């Protein structure tokens, strides 16, 4: 071993495979002989492996499948119109076991109604739902590829003769085969915008407004349980014995936005053009996050926090809120299509600044001639 300046023969290949000079000599002897068993029992009663396992072949499927479906319907009459569309996208995971499936559903519905000659109302509704499963390794706590690099020894097979996982498998692909460890994520987004447009005085006075709300819900469940394996017949051990817990995370975000403005324009005596606009906007967002972890799952297939009875309980919360609002105006005057005067002003407020610095006024004046 280079670690010991080549003065000693290593006794292990990382954590999961025993090594000795006799083992190396036996491997050399077997290299020219076919038909020998991949697994034997050594003098000490432990399994001894002579396999040729391609762990990446065990990890990945030969092929995967994805579906994408779209549908849309639209129509209109004299004073109404609508448009509805939907999409489903599903992608089967790449992994052979405990695979990383992904599903996405989107829907949008839009409609407009000309209530009166001077009033139009529109609505735009959007909904999205996503689910994703991310398998986990509990052995080293890292990604599957790192664990294969460390413990995916080609000599060790996936299973022992009695059907139990080998030590190398339990650290790598065998954890996926066991199928208990992973993170399930669900995300739902609902958004709706209602808008109105009104016009008066032969379209000289126009008022527009809209109101939007959006809710984002993110749920995540993480489950970690030990993975059983055998180093000798009839004896079960576990990888990740310190990890036996469930963690629920919920994050919700609520968003509101409102805008309204009106504008008036007219020309007097053919040379005096006047336009005025005034409006207001408001936005608000609230985020709340709750995370709870508890150990001591009473059985491996538990999927609810009530099925954990351990003494280790970790909780974590989070909350944020902000608001912004603003009022604005603009005045335009044009004389004889040659002289221009424009006055603008905004009063903006934001809760993201200290209480004595949350509001500010921003005026501007411009003039032109051609």
Cite the ranges covered by each PLM segment.
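Residues on the lipid-exposed face of transmembrane beta-strands in outer-membrane beta-barrel proteins
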Residues: 71-75, 109-113, 192-198, 260-264, ...
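Short Gly/Pro-enriched turn/cap motifs at secondary-structure boundaries
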Residues: 60-64, 319-320
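Outer-membrane beta-barrel initiation region
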Residues: 62-63, 73-77
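Outer-membrane beta-barrel channels and translocator barrels
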Residues: 66, 77-78, 114-118, 201-203, ...
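Surface-exposed loop/interface segments of Gram-negative outer-membrane beta-barrel transport/assembly proteins
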Residues: 1-52, 89, 93-191, 208-325, ...
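Short glycine/threonine-rich loop-to-helix capping motif typified by GTGT followed
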Residues: 355-360
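Extended, hydrophobic alpha-helical segments in both membrane/secreted and soluble proteins
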Residues: 107-109, 209, 258, 325-331, ...
């Amino acid at each position: 071993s280079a670690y010991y300046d080549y003065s000693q023969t290593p006794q292990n290949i990382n954590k999961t495979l025993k090594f000795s000079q006799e083992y190396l000599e036996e491997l050399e002897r077997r290299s020219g002989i076919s038909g020998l068993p991949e697994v034997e029992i050594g003098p000490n009663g432990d399994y001894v492996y002579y396999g040729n396992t391609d762990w990446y072949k065990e990890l990945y499927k030969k092929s995967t499948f994805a579906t994408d479906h779209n549908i849309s319907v639209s129509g209109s009459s004299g004073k109404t119109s609508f448009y509805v569309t939907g999409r489903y996208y599903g992608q089967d995971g790449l992994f052979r076991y405990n695979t990383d499936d992904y599903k996405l559903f989107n829907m949008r519905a839009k409609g407009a109604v000309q209530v009166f000659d001077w009033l139009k109302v529109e609505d735009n509704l959007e909904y999205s739902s996503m689910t994703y499963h991310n398998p986990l390794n509990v052995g080293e706590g890292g990604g599957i590829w790192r664990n294969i690099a460390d413990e995916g020894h080609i000599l060790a097979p996936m299973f022992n003769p009695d059907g139990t996982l080998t030590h190398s498998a339990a650290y790598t692909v065998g954890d996926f085969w066991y199928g208990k460890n992973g993170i399930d994520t669900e995300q739902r987004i609902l958004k709706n915008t209602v808008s109105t447009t009104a016009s008066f005085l032969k379209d000289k006075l126009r008022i527009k407004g809209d109101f939007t709300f959006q809710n984002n819900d993110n749920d995540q469940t993480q489950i970690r349980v030990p993975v059983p394996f055998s180093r000798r017949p009839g004896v079960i051990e576990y990888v990740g014995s310190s990890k036996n817990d469930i963690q629920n995370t919920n994050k919700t975000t609520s968003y509101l936005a409102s805008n309204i403005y009106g504008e008036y324009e007219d020309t007097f005596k053919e040379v005096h053009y006047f336009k005025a606009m005034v409006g207001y906007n408001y936005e608000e967002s609230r985020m709340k996050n709750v995370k709870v972890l508890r150990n001591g799952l009473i059985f491996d297939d538990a999927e609810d926090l009530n099925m954990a009875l351990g003494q280790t309980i970790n909780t974590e919360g989070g909350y944020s809120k902000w608001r912004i609002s603003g009022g604005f105006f603009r005045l335009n005057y044009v004389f004889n299509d040659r002289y221009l005067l424009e006055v603008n002003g905004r009063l903006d407020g934001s809760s993201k600044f200290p209480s004595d610095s949350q509001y500010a006024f921003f005026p501007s004046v411009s003039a032109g001639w051609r």
